[in-house]
């Protein structure tokens, strides 16, 4: 295999410079500022600040409301990942069997991914609004008292549904690509041997989708931790009674609403460490069970 040699020694650095600049500006600089702010205590107007060391971290980790947000985040992330990946795999399997109009169905499935998180949240809020929502009216007609603005469990179900619906399209794309990469000869051979559809799926298709599933597991975890702020802010605002206040929403609430910048910065640092540790754990242990090829 012939190696690529750049005639100009500066050219490789120029090619990677835009990515490095963006990474420094949008990751390393904010991360360093958050780390610095987490060791300071400022007044509400930002006129004075004092170095307090790890006092902000100690206060955050001993705060019951923060521990509640951690529990809410775990529940929300697990449910969102399971629902979005499960439905995406089901829809991808169904779309892969379509003979006519396959491109149309796949295009329609991808469209929800273009919807902004806040817009996705508002769509679901309108459908399940206890006062004027069509689906909430159907629930009440069937004897189900639906009011996510007062019931924390119902609020959690609503934000999970909105977040999962938003992410299904992304997962669908990768599952369809994974299904197309599976040799049809394997499925035909299993069919000749008498294996039914469900058996072929669980013994052949699903194991071969393990790399795709693992990748999506990492992506969906990061998505649930960071990219669902707009949905929660639009639908519940972290309520009722902080039942849907995730870690990222608490960072916003304490920093921009309560103006407790030191605590908010400490929470953002802890959140960053949690996501890095969780991703490293998934790559370290989960990937061992993934077989490529």
UniProtKB/Swiss-Prot annotation:
What keywords sit in the KW lines? Answer: Cell inner membrane, Cell membrane, Membrane, Transmembrane, Transmembrane helix, Transport
The record, for InterPro entries, names: MetI-like (IPR000515), MetI-like_sf (IPR035906), UgpAE/MalFG_permease (IPR050809)
**Cellular localization per UniProt:** Cell inner membrane
Q: TM spans, by residue?
A: 10-30, 72-92, 108-128, 156-176, 204-224, 261-281
Topology in the lipid bilayer is annotated as: Multi-pass membrane protein
Q: Where is the ABC transmembrane type-1 domain?
A: 66-282
Q: Has UniProt tagged this entry with the keyword Cell inner membrane?
A: yes
Q: Name one Pfam family in it.
A: BPD_transp_1
Entry-linked SUPFAM superfamilies: MetI-like
Which GO terms of type biological process are on file? transmembrane transport
Instruction: Assign the protein's first listed, main location to one coarse class.
Output: membrane
Quaternary structure note: The complex is composed of two ATP-binding proteins (UgpC), two transmembrane proteins (UgpA and UgpE) and a solute-binding protein (UgpB).
Alphabetical list of PANTHER family matching this protein: BLL4140 PROTEIN, SN-GLYCEROL-3-PHOSPHATE TRANSPORT SYSTEM PERMEASE PROTEIN UGPA
Question: So what does this one do?
Answer: Part of the ABC transporter complex UgpBAEC involved in sn-glycerol-3-phosphate (G3P) import. Probably responsible for the translocation of the substrate across the membrane.
- Please report which protein family the annotation says this sequence is part of: Belongs to the binding-protein-dependent transport system permease family.
Which NCBIfam families does this one have? PRK10561.1
Protein name per Swiss-Prot or TrEMBL: sn-glycerol-3-phosphate transport system permease protein UgpA
At the highest ranks, the source species' classification is: Bacteria, Pseudomonadati, Pseudomonadota, Alphaproteobacteria, Hyphomicrobiales
Q: Which gene encodes it?
A: ugpA
């Amino acid at each position: 295999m012939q190696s690529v040699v750049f005639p100009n020694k500066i050219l490789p650095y120029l090619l990677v410079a835009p990515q490095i600049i963006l990474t420094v500006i949008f990751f390393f600089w904010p991360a360093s500022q958050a780390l610095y702010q987490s060791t300071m205590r400022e007044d509400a107007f930002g006129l004075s600040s004092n170095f307090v060391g790890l006092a902000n971290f100690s206060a955050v980790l001993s705060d019951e409301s923060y521990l509640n947000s951690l529990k809410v985040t775990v529940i929300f992330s697990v449910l969102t990942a399971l629902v979005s990946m499960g439905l995406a795999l089901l829809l991808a399997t169904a779309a892969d069997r379509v003979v006519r109009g396959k491109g149309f169905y796949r295009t329609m499935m991808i469209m929800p991914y273009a919807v902004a998180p806040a817009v996705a949240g508002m769509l679901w809020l309108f459908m399940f609004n206890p006062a004027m929502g069509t689906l909430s009216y159907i629930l009440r007609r069937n004897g189900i008292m639906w009011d996510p603005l007062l019931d924390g469990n119902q609020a959690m179900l609503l934000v999970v549904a909105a977040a999962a619906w938003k992410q299904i399209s992304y997962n669908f794309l990768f599952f369809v690509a994974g299904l197309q990469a599976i040799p049809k000869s394997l499925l035909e051979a299993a069919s000749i041997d008498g294996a039914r559809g469900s058996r072929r799926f669980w013994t052949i298709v699903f194991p071969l989708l393990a790399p795709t599933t693992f990748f999506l597991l990492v992506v969906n975890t990061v998505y649930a931790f960071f990219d669902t702020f707009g949905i929660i802010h639009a639908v519940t605002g972290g309520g009722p009674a902080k039942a849907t206040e995730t870690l990222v929403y608490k960072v916003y609430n304490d920093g921009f609403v309560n103006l407790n910048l030191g605590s908010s910065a400490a929470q953002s640092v802890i959140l960053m460490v949690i996501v890095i540790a969780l991703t490293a754990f998934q790559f370290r242990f989960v990937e061992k069970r993934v077989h490529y090829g």
